[in-house]
């Protein structure tokens, strides 16, 4: 959906459902 989840994943993990890590930010379809 939105390209950015408003979450960073510098540690390599995303906590927002449906988001994946595209370092250093979380993204989703």
Swiss-Prot record:
Cell membrane in keyword set: no
Tissue spec. comment: Expressed in leaves, petals, petioles, and runners but not in roots (at protein level).
One Pfam family from the record: Cyclotide
Disulfide bond residue pairs: 5-19, 9-21, 14-26
Domain of life, per lineage: Eukaryota
Alphabetically ordered keywords of this record: Disulfide bond, Knottin, Plant defense
Crosslinked positions (Cyclopeptide (Gly-Asn)): 1-29
The record's account of how the chain is modified after translation: This is a cyclic peptide.
Ubl conjugation as UniProt keyword: no
GO terms classed as biological process: defense response
Family that this chain belongs to: Belongs to the cyclotide family. Moebius subfamily.
Function: Probably participates in a plant defense mechanism.
Entry comment, domain topic: The presence of a 'disulfide through disulfide knot' structurally defines this protein as a knottin.
Protein name in the entry: Cycloviolacin-O21
Organism: Viola odorata (Sweet violet)
